[in-house]
């Protein structure tokens, strides 16, 4: 209501001289936070006519108010009135009374004295009855009593004869008084949401009734209603009506007829007599046929008959010439009548989920058609006449589609030889059949029971290496988190449908699934699984090779193997063993991941290598890789089928390494560990792909880097091909040609996938392997192809597709790819260059599911990359083209993994590089946490298309095998330019993590890093040239580094490879960044980051690349957060200065943290501006989404998340962990992230703090693990245990805890913050990556990792989910806030990213606040404070309910999309009445802040202006005065 002022007075020349006063008739005190009626009102009691007191906190009306005899309108809605005083009777002239939204329980009897009342608005009050006096208000024309407690109306209600509008919605009325027939003037009657079981008899007597709402009641028949000749609008939806009378034609004036959600089996022919009908909705009924007379509705504009059982449409539908909207979704239509072409005014037509096998040519006549949804049908192609639809703006062929319009190409029909239109999404594979199958076929009761018993403990028997090699693919873990925990059923191999049933947790499908045959010719099933995220939750994909990693991932891609690596508590002995295992994994190329298909892995390696040199055609090699897992086709299918199974429980089951000789079992145990971690990661990430991906990723991380690289290369080619996944993987594709096609999402889709390259992948020996790195769909997708050898089709396709779009295939891909990779990761390691496989889990880290969109499933991505021609790949490749210059062209990015398995696993393996068995450490703590959020999202189907893989990313766990020695060295060589030899060198476990660098750009960075695929050379301990690149990615020179230094080879992605991707893949496809307008990840990671000194940069670049899991670890990266964390911990803190890190583009932030692995790496990252700051590492993202009980995906979610919930992508809600995870679980989740954070270089992770004293050149120190790193690590762990409260809730970890001391908690926090802050510059460009849930997780994880630069295992201790004490939190509060903000924002944006520019609007740049917020203790104390490390996962922070602070960037469109309350002079807030701060009270669902803010958020700053002690009005004006971009620092109470 607008404030009105009437000035009544004599027109005097100058009233001011005459002393005349204005006569006030209208006063408006709305929204003034008043607790009582202002006394000024009474000064005008004689003249006051209108008084507005809306939205205050008035509890009672003073008697004086009723002396205002002239008052005609009294408006007091939204206050705290509990009653109306009887003195209201004195307002005899009152005409309008509005008391809605109060606590008024009844009207006083004497309200009858207000004879002039014409309008009463009393909705939303606990009014249980109306007094008899109420019926004496004879002048009443409008009465609104919605949402009250009325059970009946007064018997003489009919006396209100002048009533025109009567709204009684949402009450408890069961009948109407008979006197109602006297309401002759009643035109609108709303009785919706009441308890009518039959239509009141009096209704047919209200002849003038024009609008009638009777929805949401229990009506079964509609007698008499057809007698209302004047009726224009009739809503009878949501009742139990079974039949409609022939008399319906009596309502001859009817224009809108809504009969949705009833039990109608047919419509009467007389419906054709409703000549004026413009809207007819009969959706959600049981109609089997439509009457032919429907063609007589010549004025019909909207017709909705979705969700029925129609098997045909009447040909008379062609007479509906006025029709504009036609919805026939979810029916059983095998074809459309040719006459439909006559409906030439139709602009929107949806035919989703039918059985259409072909479309009539006549559709080409529907010239005005703008939106056409054909998803989930059985179309093999489109008629050539589609080329005539010039106005077509959206053509939906798949639920996983990332772009509204996907290019079509002309082909000749194989049978008729006619020209038809097709693309990679054809032929369609309906998910329905698959879904139906998965419930029964893929459900294994025995497996379910076994898993249920073991859900909380995953025991991996690590036998001798031989056994490990043989069984690497098998998940020995017998128990996983029960699927029910994830709301999933353990559907073993074919959860094609898994419609949200309780799937076993990732279906302990590991072994069983592996052993279970996966229908090779089950593309539909796989597709169904993938396509239905809802299914994917329940799906438990078998992870043949990924068994080691326990097929948790198969579950939903979220829970994958999350717990596999969870150690109840990382006791010193355990840590040592774990480290040894990791080292062994790193040191032993193929034993660790060897699976039943280990031989195939070897083949894959060779094949991959060949692929590396070939282009897409090499796909068969990828297939081989897939074969190594199980049957490539089967695996793929399985992966596809059980993507949802990948979901891991928020708190993954704990893994217990049964092997006593961890070193011996390192091969298997390490691999298994890796698998476990990675699986967890991938499952968390994949969500859709989880079964195979997570498993495969985890188990098969071993996939050869070579194959990964090959995949990446292929991916480039594939992307070039666009959607030729089938071509890429002819063999596996055969099994799932449709899937592959589907998977090959349009280029538009690709970027989404690219958003989330598995960091692990990149990390894996093929940091250079663009494909790995490109988890996001870039090279990583190619890598997925390699993983595809598990399910070649699935993998390569899935990756690509997943990158691209959300093809259902993607889901499948994801599921399958990872397990293989994990399994074969070890094999892949076989080649020296392929040493990286040692970190198999990295690969599995994330295979993006269609929804996840390359969340964090490197293996999936990797598999897809080589073979999949998804546009996404192209996009990544293009971006990588920009990167190529920085990469040394020397080593093309041949896939170093010889094993076909290598796919993503390989990438991880490369990253693992097995630098030194003794030194390799597996950090899993974070990855598990990440995974869980992602899984959570998957579970809740939070992933949005946009979220796709990216969002899902956070669900995966990444484990990096980082030899402690390599910490420093690995760090050095892990730089973006990570030396091939380093990466490949067994001692370069960290090298294998090089992908961490690319993480930020999972897409193009993968390419870039892929080119630095040094891993092939990795084993050679020769001097390598490390190339430095300027920000433009132009090589500035090569620095020769000795192998011992473990400087990662310059990104040896062959510039050719990288370039190829760049050329082949549209930038949009190449990288989510590019897609969203963000600078390519590669650019973001450009080595030009000046902050790192050139030399250090060179080393750092290489070291960073390999060493920083973070790099790889973009939110999308598959590498487990912990691994990345470890890598980064080793190198990043020392090598990068906080400023450097921050200097990097936002993507880099997360990666940076992971990059902390080595100084050189971090420097490189800085230089790149990508690794750390550019986007959060996958871990970070994951940490955000996963670590924090953030509600990912949704809102990401999505994330996407998705969806990841927008709540706080990085917030603790990501993982709905109600109970704190055990220390082991925490460690397992956090280590990788923590490790990243721990990298000595990261002290400046709180980069703004610039605490990181280690100079850029410190990279060496970063790269090298302190001699006593183990002790330090153990101390850190112990300290963390003791000081968990000391750690920041967020990823801010006292860096001091880390052995590198130099990296203090600040560093870790900074890492988180960095992502946000750095992002502020590049927000739009780079945030997308971070926005992916996985990235977000990475950020969180990374922050933690950065925080504790000490031992690799430090992350475990740090990884605890304990929330640091408030004091610490406050110290790093700002920092944390920014981190959190960035995480949550990133997470959201991630969700949004794949499909929308949301990323832009929510750029999670860490305002300077994150950096500024130093963690003094963390900075000051580096080594000694492990206990303090913020290693607590970001997810943890919310667990304790600590308020988290975030940085949120909102782009006005046109407004900010949220409402605030509170302030010094405000009316308070409903969240914390005692807090006078500014709180967000409402967020517009689809507005700019929808994914960023949530009610209850406290605004601390806006564009630098403090909102802590600000008046409400000033805050409103300030927010309105800002231009387009508003950067907020908010505080959110995060609770799990």
Swiss-Prot record:
Keyword Cytoplasm among record annotations: yes
Example of a GO MF term: protein kinase binding
Highest taxon listed in the record's lineage: Eukaryota
Segments of skewed composition (Basic and acidic residues): 662-675, 871-881, 1131-1143, 1242-1262
TM region(s), chain numbering: none
Intervals holding LRR repeats: 21-44, 45-68, 70-91, 92-114, 116-137, 138-159, 160-183, 185-206, 207-228, 230-251, 252-274, 275-297, 299-320, 321-343, 345-366, 367-389, 392-415
Omega-N-methylarginine modifications at: 1148
Pfam hit, one: PDZ
Domain PDZ as annotated: residue spans: 1444-1534
Region (Disordered): 662-706, 783-894, 1131-1160, 1235-1264, 1331-1359
Family per similarity comment: Belongs to the LAP (LRR and PDZ) protein family.
Protein name: Leucine-rich repeat-containing protein 7
Gene (name only): LRRC7
